[in-house]
Amino acid sequence: MRKAYLIAEVTVHDMEAYEHYRQQVVATLEAADARFLVRGGKRMQMEGADEAHHDNLRTVIVEFPSMEAALAWYESPAYITLIELRQSAADGRVFFVEGT
């Protein structure tokens, strides 16, 4: 079975609310047997359009056992309750990619 990866690129505009989201999301990921590969950290953009608000830009990569597990997590009642909190604290893109 191929692993799946959540990739999120978000610009945080409410750090307090985003930190509240970050603290709560961990338990939902642990329950889905997922793990963080990247959680923030230093970014070095090498190509493409320059992103505004570098200090508030976050990249997150999470590994899931499969695409099915990733989708089940995203649609789970535990995570659905956190989506609104994340969206109120940050704007960005969230997508899944299947690994090889």
Placement of each model-derived feature along the sequence:
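Conserved, structured core segments of small domains
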Residues: 1-100
